Amino acid sequence: IVFVVSMVPIVELRGAIPIAEGLGLNIFWYYPIAIIGNILPVPIIYLFARKVLEWGKDKKIIGKFFTWCLEKGDKGGKKLKESAGNNGIFWALLIFVGIPLPGTGAWTGTLAASFLNIDFKTSISAVTLGVLLAGIIMSLGSKIVAWLGWVGVIAIVAVIAIIVIASILIKKKRK
């Protein structure tokens, strides 16, 4: 179940790891399985996403939209390469995939890289490292929830929020 859930778009390992933790599975068992399941579709997505757009650009119903996607992607990719360079693109993609927020997983990152025409090696390595980072964050978060329960987590988040708000107010007051 962990392997299959980690391959599902949007859910990915962000859903698979908490499920595994909830089932009481061992982290040394579920972490690599979730990672492999999440990374497995990445090269396939990269290689075929752009090809689907190129195939569809001359089709009657979808042609205009697919052409727009390709043109927008090429323009955005060139702009991104000029402003950030390959190194900047690598780190941006890694962070985008690695911070486990809704809609920022391996599928979305790989689709974006493919549409933006970012090279294969940069895309796959950044997404893979991002998946590893997201897996670590989700595993730690799941363990914390398992140890403290939701009430404990909410209490910690509330304390952090109060500290952040207090520090902002103190800085504003000093000015």
What are these regions (language model features)?
Residues 1-2, 23-97, 145-175:
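Membrane-interfacial helix-loop-helix
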Residues 1-40, 47, 79-142:
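Hydrophobic alpha-helical membrane segments of integral membrane proteins
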